[in-house]
Curated annotation (Swiss-Prot):
Anything else known: The 15-deoxyoxalicine B cluster is a rare cluster that contains its own geranylgeranyl pyrophosphate synthase (olcC), in contrast to other related clusters which rely on a FPP/GGPP synthase localized outside of the cluster.
Cellular compartment(s): Membrane
Gene that encodes it: olcD
Protein name: Terpene cyclase olcD
Organism field: Penicillium canescens
Consequence of gene loss (knockout): Abolishes the production of 15-deoxyoxalicine B.
Keywords of the record: Lyase, Membrane, Transmembrane, Transmembrane helix
Length: 241
């Protein structure tokens, strides 16, 4: 996707390109921190917050745009995918008991995951055919993000536990995706000849939906973590009595 080659941008964008670069670095760093923190927390807690269905969609998105439509700077996508392999392993190994308590289900979970990746890759390719690669890159990425945010919030409420998750994981993914959205709207303003498509009601709705879902997630996580900490303190007091 040559559209992401910012060296070809008009002069008015070049003057403020450093701001776009900062947002891109923050985006890349945020999600790398999220991935590494997810792997570390999963092995510490023997649980993983990452829902498998959104993860398969995200992996398909990375595969499609790494192999078929690589943007300039695509090594970061490749690095994301490499680290994501650790997230995949963690999510499959420490899948919630409801998804892995049956031996047959647990045995075929990796196969089902691969099939899901193939299905989502088909969807991303269809989106590219309808919208062209550049818009599909962002709309597909936001679809993955909203699935992740909604499923993570649902899992947090359903399990009533913060095991497998952390403030670092939540905050880093919020910072990463917020930087991606800020960069997108920034380019739509300063480079409208190529990026005006991003300044529309649907993209603003996607941004708002992400903010609401992950905002509610943060509040619910704080409430559960506070309750868990209080239970730990109460248990310690009972042991000393």
């Amino acid at each position: 996707m040559e559209s992401l080659d910012f060296t070809k941008a008009p002069p008015e964008f070049q003057e403020v390109k450093y701001l776009s670069d900062i947002l891109l670095v923050t985006l890349a760093s945020g999600w790398l921190v999220c991935y590494f923190a997810t792997i570390r927390t999963a092995f510490c807690d023997r649980a993983c917050w990452m829902p498998l269905l959104p993860l398969s969609c995200n992996v398909a998105w990375e595969l499609v745009f790494i192999t078929l439509y690589p943007p300039p700077g695509s090594p970061i996508l490749g690095f994301w995918l490499l680290v994501n392999l650790g997230v995949i392993y963690s999510a499959l190994r420490f899948a919630p008991s409801k998804a892995s308590h049956l031996a047959v289900e647990k045995h075929y979970l990796p196969v089902l995951f691969v099939l899901a990746v193939g299905f989502w890759a088909w969807g991303h390719l269809a989106l590219i055919e309808q919208l062209n690669p550049l818009p599909a890159f962002y709309y597909g990425g936001m679809a993955c993000q909203l699935m992740t945010s909604a499923a993570a919030l649902s899992g947090l409420v359903d399990q009533g536990s913060t095991q497998g998750a952390s403030y670092t994981i939540w905050l880093s993914r919020v910072i990463g995706t917020s930087s991606a959205l800020a960069g997108l709207f920034f380019r739509a303003h300063y480079w409208p000849s190529l990026w005006a498509w991003a300044d529309n009601e649907l993209m603003r709705w996607l941004a708002a939906a992400f903010g609401i879902l992950d905002g509610v997630y943060g509040v619910q996580f704080w409430r559960l973590r506070r309750s868990e900490n209080q239970l730990t303190i109460d248990h310690a007091h009972r042991k000393t009595e």
